């Protein structure tokens, strides 16, 4: 820590890292820890010149006062009586932390795994809370020590990881009130930024625990391509290696030798996947080390000083530097055949030969650092190993049960992980095991996958559990295909958010309360979240109601004007507290909203596996307010020294001026080698009426209008990327009239209710319009059954609620 931020005594040390972040240390031996730890790698991320604080004595207590915190301490071993910090601006009781207090109001973080989960599980703490404070205890983590000089280092390729001395406490107090985003950004400052992901990681992943042959796998990829279903990542589960081994060796879960019965020419197989536009990861379970039946055994045994003739197993030991070197040499050989990155499937607990060292953390740390060698783009795929794990993306959440309960938990789980800075979870989309077949459930899970950090389809080896869309009936099949195509189309948008995350510490997915911390309603929609800067996503996690033929999701829209991303319908949230309602959707879509002024870039040629910067782009515009989006692209090459600020990048700013009804696509700024010299642009305005259009000041008739989505599409054509392009409406861009009658008729038409009741409902709507709801609530239809009894039927609650959404949206 910078000496300027430190107040120190014989056995205690306090560091004022920011005006809201305090480090608290107690040491029985009077020595303090300055090395990087497994979690914390930078305690000097903010200039002390910008930190305002006063330090003084008052009634025998040490007092530290900043604009946000008031700390008092008796200079004794930490106790609830002797150490407290008040967060200014928060409730006097709940906003004051006493040492050892329970974090009962913590907004939570994430968990190591969802293995075996069938619904909600407990989560660890995050760095934000309702009460305005959170505590990160780093006392037990190991420290990183460079071999050559003993100095702390997190950048050395393989720094030594050493246990801490006993009798020391090391706490970080986050007192940010409800400045949640700032708290997480400073957590990144303390623990390191989230790395930039390679572009291919944001596309669709195909994964299945299944004994494919090479020919079967390649044929499947060809079938996807023929169906126009894009994938960018091919996951090969554990059957790539030999799994049927002699019982004397133990289980077949660990392996490093290709199963040549399934993959007779591994290098050719991986080359073919690359040729088809797919990057590849192989699954490994490292626990059992390297045994005598493995091809790499002899060389590794000699390296480790074991006589290969003995057949003695090479024990897995990440605390042994010799083993680690030999272990990675073995992986490098496989990478030389074409493996792009590794799926580290560690499920065997948290104990190594070194006190306090979790093997999962060590594997993640070493694999990620190793993956960056020789200018490669670093990437690994593994489970969460505690705070700071965001430095080693991507996260594998584990094997979940196929159930509505599992689906229902995942949006909340994903968004809440942002509270501990963990933004790149990859779930088993569709669920992995057990459960029951439910085609609607699978479709909804695919839709969640589109608006998830990573979209990786996965399933078990059961012949009945394949996730290929053609295994499902219509309309589920089409919903699945549409979802996968949309995910690929969203890549320019998501990749820009990927850059935002790496540079600004702004995650792709943020809970609603990050942006609206003082709105109580924002805490009441746990499955709703911001998906990047422009969109709010609300996955449907309940089964369809049979009466309305729709499924619902609880929605809260903050004050302002919003548009349905798919249909262009406009929602006016006029009051300061926002608008609460249930959104009802058929199987084909889920609720996604864009605020007025929203701009979303899509790649038009989305039915390919390409991850190149596209030559054709579509810009979705949601009018009603000014908007701006800066599209970030790079040349696909990672910075050799890991400094992404030195990468070749290009920014294309797209802006919409609502007053003049003009969209401007600015000339690309930055490295001209990044973007195509010419690019074909299409601009689609959602929620508008048909209007006359000019392109660069000239009237254009190359437009089309889609009544279903209230969308005006302008085909701009192929333009040089070093010149501005404008799309304007000389007579103004008029918002579309709200098709209330059409939408309510569609609800009534789909409803599985008596025809006379449909007709009565339609008549009430024709007569009363948007004021028809009281009449609809009192409607009923009586009929006689075959025994002469009277049967009374009213509009079902689901039909009424679906109609209510339409009537109240504007």
Predicted regions and their residues:
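Catalytic core of carbohydrate-active enzymes
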Residues: 368, 387-395, 409-413, 417-427, ...
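Charged/polar low-complexity intrinsically disordered segments, enriched in acidic residues
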Residues: 736-790
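Solvent-exposed beta-strand/loop surfaces of large extracellular or lumenal domains
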Residues: 36-51, 306, 563-587, 692-716
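Aromatic- and carboxylate-enriched substrate-binding clefts and catalytic-loop regions
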Residues: 96, 230-480, 515-521, 525, ...
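A conserved hydrophobic secondary-structure block that centers on an alpha-helix together
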Residues: 116-117, 194-197, 201, 207-264
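A low-complexity, Ser/Thr/Gly/Pro-enriched, surface-exposed linker/loop concept
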Residues: 17-59
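Catalytic and substrate-binding clefts that recognize carbohydrates or anionic sugar/phosphate headgroups
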Residues: 52-199, 208-209, 214-215, 221-226, ...
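Short, well-ordered beta-strand segments enriched in hydrophobic/aromatic residues
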Residues: 14, 22-26, 63-71, 536-539, ...
């Amino acid at each position: 820590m910078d000496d300027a931020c430190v107040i120190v005594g014989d056995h205690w040390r306090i560091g004022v890292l920011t005006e809201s972040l305090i480090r608290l240390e107690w040491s029985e031996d009077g020595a303090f820890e300055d090395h990087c730890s497994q979690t914390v790698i930078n305690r000097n991320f903010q200039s002390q010149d910008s930190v305002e604080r006063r330090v003084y004595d008052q009634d025998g207590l040490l007092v530290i006062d900043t604009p946000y915190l008031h700390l008092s301490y008796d200079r004794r071993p930490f106790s609830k009586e002797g150490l407290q910090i008040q967060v200014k601006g928060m409730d006097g009781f709940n906003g004051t932390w006493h040492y050892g207090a329970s974090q009962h109001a913590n907004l939570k973080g994430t968990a190591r795994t969802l293995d075996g989960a069938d619904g909600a599980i407990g989560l660890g703490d995050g760095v934000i809370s309702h009460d305005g404070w959170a505590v990160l205890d780093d006392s037990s983590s190991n420290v990183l020590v460079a071999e050559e000089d003993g100095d702390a280092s997190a950048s050395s390729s393989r720094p030594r990881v050493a246990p801490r001395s006993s009798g020391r406490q090391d706490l970080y107090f986050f007192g940010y009130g409800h400045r949640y985003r700032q708290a997480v950004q400073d957590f990144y400052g303390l623990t390191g930024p989230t790395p930039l992901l390679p572009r291919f990681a944001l596309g669709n992943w195909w994964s299945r625990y299944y004994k494919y042959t090479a020919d079967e796998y390649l044929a499947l990829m060809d079938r996807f391509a023929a169906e126009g279903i894009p994938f960018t990542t091919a996951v090969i589960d554990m059957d790539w290696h030999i799994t049927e081994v002699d019982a004397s060796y133990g289980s077949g879960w660990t392996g490093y030798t290709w199963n040549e019965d399934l993959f007779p020419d591994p290098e050719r197989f991986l080359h073919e996947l690359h040729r088809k536009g797919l990057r590849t990861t192989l699954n490994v379970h490292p626990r059992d080390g390297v045994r005598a039946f493995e091809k790499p055994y002899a060389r590794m045994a000699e390296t480790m000083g074991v006589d290969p003739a003995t057949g003695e197993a090479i024990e897995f030991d990440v605390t042994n530097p010799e083993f680690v070197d030999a272990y990675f040499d073995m992986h490098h050989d496989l990478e030389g055949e074409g493996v792009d990155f590794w799926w580290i499937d560690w499920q065997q607990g948290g104990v190594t030969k070194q006190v306090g060292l979790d093997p999962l953390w060590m594997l993640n740390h070493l694999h990620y650092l190793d993956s960056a060698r020789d200018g490669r783009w670093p990437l690994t795929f593994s489970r969460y190993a505690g705070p700071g794990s965001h430095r080693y993306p991507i996260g594998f959440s584990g094997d979940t049960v196929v159930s509505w309960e599992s689906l229902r938990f995942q949006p909340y789980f994903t968004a809440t992980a942002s509270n501990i800075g963990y933004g790149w979870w990859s779930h088993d989309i569709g669920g992995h095991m057990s459960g029951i077949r439910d085609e609607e459930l699978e479709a909804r899970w695919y839709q969640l996958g589109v608006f998830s950090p990573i979209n990786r389809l996965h399933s078990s080896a059961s012949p009945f559990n394949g996730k290929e869309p053609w295994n499902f009936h219509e309309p589920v099949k089409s919903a699945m295909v549409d979802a996968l195509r949309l995910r690929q189309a969203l890549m320019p948008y998501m990749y820009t958010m990927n850059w935002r995350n790496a540079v600004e510490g702004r995650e792709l997915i943020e809970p609603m309360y990050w942006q609206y911390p003082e709105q109580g309603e924002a805490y009441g929609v746990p499955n709703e979240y911001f998906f990047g800067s422009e969109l709010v996503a609300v996955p449907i996690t309940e089964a369809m109601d049979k009466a309305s033929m729709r499924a619902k999701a609880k929605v809260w829209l903050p004050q302002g004007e919003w548009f349905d991303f798919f249909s262009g319908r406009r929602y006016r949230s006029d009051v300061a507290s926002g608008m609460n309602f249930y959104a009802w959707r058929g199987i084909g879509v889920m609720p996604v909203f864009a605020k007025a002024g929203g701009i979303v870039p899509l790649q038009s040629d989305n039915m390919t596996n390409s991850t190149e910067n596209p030559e054709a782009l579509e810009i979705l515009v949601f009018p009603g307010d000014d908007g701006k989006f800066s599209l970030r692209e790079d040349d696909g090459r990672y910075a050799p020294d890991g400094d992404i600020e030195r990468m070749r990048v290009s920014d294309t700013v797209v802006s919409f001026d609502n007053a003049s009804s003009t969209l401007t696509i600015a000339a690309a700024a930055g490295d001209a080698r990044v973007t195509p010299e010419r690019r074909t642009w299409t601009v689609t305005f959602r929620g508008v009426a048909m209007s006359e259009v000019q392109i660069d000041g000239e009237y254009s008739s190359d437009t089309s209008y889609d009544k279903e989505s209230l969308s005006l599409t302008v085909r701009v054509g192929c333009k040089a990327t070093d010149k501005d392009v404008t799309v304007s409406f000389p007579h103004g861009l008029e918002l579309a009239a709200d098709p209330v009658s059409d939408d309510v008729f569609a609800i009534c038409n789909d409803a599985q209710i008596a025809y006379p009741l449909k007709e009565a409902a339609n008549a009430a709507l024709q007569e009363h319009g948007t004021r028809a709801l009281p009449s609809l609530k009192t409607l009923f239809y009586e009929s006689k059954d075959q025994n002469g009894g009277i049967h009374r039927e009213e509009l079902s609650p689901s039909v009424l609620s679906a109609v209510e959404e339409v009537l109240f949206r504007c």
